Swiss-Prot record:
One of its GO terms (biological process) is translation. This is Large ribosomal subunit protein bL35. Keywords: Ribonucleoprotein, Ribosomal protein. The keyword Ribonucleoprotein applies. One of its GO terms (molecular function) is structural constituent of ribosome. Belongs to the bacterial ribosomal protein bL35 family. It holds the Pfam family Ribosomal_L35p. GO terms for cellular component: cytosolic large ribosomal subunit. It comes from the Bacteria.
Amino acid sequence: MIKKKSHSGLKKRIKITKKKKLLRGHAYKNHLAASKTTKQNRQLRGVVCVDHSDYKRIKTLIRGL
């Protein structure tokens, strides 16, 4: 039987907390920051917990959750 592997791209983008929550960064902040407002750039900083509906989908891609 083939070993099931975790999605390596997803492993680099998500951090798993001690209580099995998934943290992710915001989208839309790689470039073109000058055209966005200061408020937009400030709100895109930091990390956010993954939504519960997405958690079920992501759980299948990461083994060991």
